[in-house]
């Protein structure tokens, strides 16, 4: 298996646990992390001994608390993108999302803490979503003047219905784990 800077991959008893670990950035997805995620998923997909993939966010290094599953795309990296660079980033980011959706292994998002923007979207790309009590979901992109990327508008509407999806997207309001369960965004709290 490959070595990663922003991911940790553990395989045991036919289960791969893939942990996104960028605690200083609340596990936000930058280009390097997306490339590593794509590499890891490609390697996992090719292994017959792995039946289940659990995607989760790593803890904060200071207090070991789980503050963020994935806080979205890394805005600090994106802020200086030109239009062609932003388009290329969106295309690059969509690859691991579609890979998650189409894997032969069962994919589970174990959501702990923030799942905002791209974090909510990567969770929705998984077959099953399980949220901890401290999970917070949201689509804050409209507050930045953009729409949810990475398939977020389509997946959210399929999971929670068009009305709820529009409300979450247009208002940029976050919801807690219990509300996410109530509306069908997660399978279990």
Please state what every model-predicted region is.
Residues 1-58, 84, 98:
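Conserved CoA-thioester-binding segment of acyl-CoA-metabolizing enzymes
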Residues 1-13, 58-66, 172-178, 189:
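C-terminal alpha-helix plus adjacent terminal tail
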Residues 18, 55, 74, 122-124, ...:
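Hydrophobic/aromatic residues within transmembrane alpha-helices
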Residues 21, 73, 112:
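Histidine-centered beta-alpha loop that forms part of the nucleotide-sugar donor binding/catalytic region
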Residues 28-31, 71, 80, 170, ...:
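Phosphate-coordinating loops and pocket residues in cytosolic domains that bind phosphorylated ligands
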Residues 33-36, 89-92, 122:
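Hydrophobic alpha-helical membrane-association signature
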Residues 57-96, 115, 145:
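Glycine- (often His-adjacent) and acidic-residue-rich active-site loop
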Residues 99-189:
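Crotonase-fold acyl-CoA enzyme core
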């Amino acid at each position: 298996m490959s070595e990663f800077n922003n991911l940790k991959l553990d395989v045991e008893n036919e289960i791969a646990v893939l942990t996104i670990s960028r605690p200083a950035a609340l596990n936000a997805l930058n280009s390097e992390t997306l490339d590593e995620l794509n590499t890891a998923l490609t390697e996992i997909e090719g292994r017959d001994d792995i039946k289940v993939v659990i995607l989760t966010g790593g803890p904060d290094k200071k207090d070991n608390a789980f503050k963020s599953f994935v806080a979205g795309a890394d805005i600090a990296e994106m802020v200086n993108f030109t239009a062609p660079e932003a388009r290329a980033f969106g295309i690059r980011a969509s690859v691991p999302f579609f890979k998650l959706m189409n894997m032969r292994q069962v994919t589970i998002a174990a959501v702990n803490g923030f799942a905002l923007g791209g974090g909510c979207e990567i969770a929705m790309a998984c077959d099953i979503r399980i949220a901890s009590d401290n999970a917070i979901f949201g689509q804050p992109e409209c507050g930045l003047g953009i729409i949810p990327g990475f398939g977020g508008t389509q997946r959210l509407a399929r999971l929670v219905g068009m009305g709820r999806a529009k409300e979450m997207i247009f208002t940029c309001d976050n919801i807690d784990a219990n509300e996410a369960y109530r509306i069908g965004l997660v399978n279990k709290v």
